[in-house]
C-alpha cells in the first residue's frame, strides 16, 4: 500500500485557493442537466465523485463540454426528465452526492418507460438509502432493491413522481431530503414534505434551496419541518454558475493555522452558502484569531482551549475539530454526530481508533467523542489507516504539527474531493 510520511512542521504560513465544493459541484451538474437552456459551471471540482456524476449524465444522454483542466463544464440542459435506453446500468463508485440525487431524479416520468440500475463500490452497498426510497415510494415512484433491503444497488423505472403528502426521516442524512427536493418540482403534482425526527446537517439543505432558487425554483418551508413544492415546473438555466470553494476542505488549512501559524483561504467568505464556513467560528470559540472577508477567511494561531459542542450542523468539518482538540488546553467533546457512522466509513470508530494510536485518550460514544489533549512531545509516531475515506487522510495530516512525524496510508484516497491536497498542505508548511 502507498504511504506518505509527513515530517514535523514548525509553522504554517501562506494562502490557499480552494477547489470547488463537492456538494455544490454535483448539485450544479444535476440541476444544469435537468434545466432548460445551457449552463456554464465554473470552479467545478475535479475529483472522483464529480467524474461519477459526469459519466452518469453522459450515459443518460446529456451533452456537455469539459475544459482541459476539468474545472469548467458547459452543460446542455434537457429541460425535464431524463430519457435513456432500457437496461442502462450506472456505476457511481462511493459518491453519495451522485447516488442519492440521481435515485430521485431518475424516478421522474419519462416519455417512454425504461429501467435503470444504480450501483457502486462495496462501501456504497453498505450506505443506507431506505429513508429516501421510502419517501419516493410514497409519491408513486417505482424503485426496487436488488440485493439488501434498504441499500443500493437499486432498479428504478421512470414511471413518475406524483406529489402529495410525503414523510421523510431526516435523522440519518440530509442528502435524502436534498434528493427529494431537487426532483419534486419536475414531478406530476404538488408535494408537501414532512420531516420525521431531527433533521441533520440543516446547512446542507440551505445549500440545496439556494441552488434551486438560482435555477428558478422557490421552495416554501416552515422551520425545516414542512416543505411545499409545486409540481410541473422547470428549472431554468442561470447561464453561468460559479461553484464556491469547498468549505469542508478549508477546515484543514484553517485548523493548521490555528495550531501553528497563519493562513488565508480564498474561495469562501462570510456570504458563503455552505454551513461548513461556520467551522471558523468554532476555531474562534477555541481561541483562534479569525478574520472574515467577502471571499476569504483568515485564521491566525493563539492559545486554543477545548470545547464541548453539538456539531450536528457541520459534521464533515467537525472531524477536523477532533484533531485540533489534541493541541488545545482541556478536553473537547463533539456531540450529536451519529451520522459520522454512515459516511464513507464509520468515522466515529475510525477517528477514535486512529487517535488512540497516537497516544491520545479518547472516549467513543454512540453519537459523541470525548478527546483529551496531548503535549507536543507526547505524540507517538503512527501509521494512520484511512479506510478509503478522504477526510480521515486530510484530518490526520495535521498530526505533523506536533513534534512527531505521521505516516498516512493510502494518501491517494483524497482524490474523492481534493486530489492535490498533500501538495497544497506542503506549500504552507514551513520548517525553519
Swiss-Prot record:
Q: What class of enzyme is it?
A: transferase
Q: Cystine bridges: which residues?
A: none
| Record's keyword terms, sorted | Amino-acid biosynthesis, Aromatic amino acid biosynthesis, Cytoplasm, Transferase
Q: What GO molecular function annotation could you give as one example from this UniProt entry?
A: 3-phosphoshikimate 1-carboxyvinyltransferase activity
Active-site residues annotated for this sequence: 316 (proton acceptor)
Gene3D superfamilies in UniProt: Enolpyruvate transferase domain (3.65.10.10)
**Matching PROSITE patterns:** EPSP_SYNTHASE_1, EPSP_SYNTHASE_2
- What PANTHER family does the database record attribute to this sequence? AROM/DEHYDROQUINATE SYNTHASE (PTHR21090), PENTAFUNCTIONAL AROM POLYPEPTIDE (PTHR21090:SF5)
NCBIfam families in alphabetical order: aroA
The UniProt subunit note reads as follows:
Monomer.
Its recorded name reads: 3-phosphoshikimate 1-carboxyvinyltransferase
What is the species of this protein? Histophilus somni (strain 2336) (Haemophilus somnus)
Amino acid at each position: 500500500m502507498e504511504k506518505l510520511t509527513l515530517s514535523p512542521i514548525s509553522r504554517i504560513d501562506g494562502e490557499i485557493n480552494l477547489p470547488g465544493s463537492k456538494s455544490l459541484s454535483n448539485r450544479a451538474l444535476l440541476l444544469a442537466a435537468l434545466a432548460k437552456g445551457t449552463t456554464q459551471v465554473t470552479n467545478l471540482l475535479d475529483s472522483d465523485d464529480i467524474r461519477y456524476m459526469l459519466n452518469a449524465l453522459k450515459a443518460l444522454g446529456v451533452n456537455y463540454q469539459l475544459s482541459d483542466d476539468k474545472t469548467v463544464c458547459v452543460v446542455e440542459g434537457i429541460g425535464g426528465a431524463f430519457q435513456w435506453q432500457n437496461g442502462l446500468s450506472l456505476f457511481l463508485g462511493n459518491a453519495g452526492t451522485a447516488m442519492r440525487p440521481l435515485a430521485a431524479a431518475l424516478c421522474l416520468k419519462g416519455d417512454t418507460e425504461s429501467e435503470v440500475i444504480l450501483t457502486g463500490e462495496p462501501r456504497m452497498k453498505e450506505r443506507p438509502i431506505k429513508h429516501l426510497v421510502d419517501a419516493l415510494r410514497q409519491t408513486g415512484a417505482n424503485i426496487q432493491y436488488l440485493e439488501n433491503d434498504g441499500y443500493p444497488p437499486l432498479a428504478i423505472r421512470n414511471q413518475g413522481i406524483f406529489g402529495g403528502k410525503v414523510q421523510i426521516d431526516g435523522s440519518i442524512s440530509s442528502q435524502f431530503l436534498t434528493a427529494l427536493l431537487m426532483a419534486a418540482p419536475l414531478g406530476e403534482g404538488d408535494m408537501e414534505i414532512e420531516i420525521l425526527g431531527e433533521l441533520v446537517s440543516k446547512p446542507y439543505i440551505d445549500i440545496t434551496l439556494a441552488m434551486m432558487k438560482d435555477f428558478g425554483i422557490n421552495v416554501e418551508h416552515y422551520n425545516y419541518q414542512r416543505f411545499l413544492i409545486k409540481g410541473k415546473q422547470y428549472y431554468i438555466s442561470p447561464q453561468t454558475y460559479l461553484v464556491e470553494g469547498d468549505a469542508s476542505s478549508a477546515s484543514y488549512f484553517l485548523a493548521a493555522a490555528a495550531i501553528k501559524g497563519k493562513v488565508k483561504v480564498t474561495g469562501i467568505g462570510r456570504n458563503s452558502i455552505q454551513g461548513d464556513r461556520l467551522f471558523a467560528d468554532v476555531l474562534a470559540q477555541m481561541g483562534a484569531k479569525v478574520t472574515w472577508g467577502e471571499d476569504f477567511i483568515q485564521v491566525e494561531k493563539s492559545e486554543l482551549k477545548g470545547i464541548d459542542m453539538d456539531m450536528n450542523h457541520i459534521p464533515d468539518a467537525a472531524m477536523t475539530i477532533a484533531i485540533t482538540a489534541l493541541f488545545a488546553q482541556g478536553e473537547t467533546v463533539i456531540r450529536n454526530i451519529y451520522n459520522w457512522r454512515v459516511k464513507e466509513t464509520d468515522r466515529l470508530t475510525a477517528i477514535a481508533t486512529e487517535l488512540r494510536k497516537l497516544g491520545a485518550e479518547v472516549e467513543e460514544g454512540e453519537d459523541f467523542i470525548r478527546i483529551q489533549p496531548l503535549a507536543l512531545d507526547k505524540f507517538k509516531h503512527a501509521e494512520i489507516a484511512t479506510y478509503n475515506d478522504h477526510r480521515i487522510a486530510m484530518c490526520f495530516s495535521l498530526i505533523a504539527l506536533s513534534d512527531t512525524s505521521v505516516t498516512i496510508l493510502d494518501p491517494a484516497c483524497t482524490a474523492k474531493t481534493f486530489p492535490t491536497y498533500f501538495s497544497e498542505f506542503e506549500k504552507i508548511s514551513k520548517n525553519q
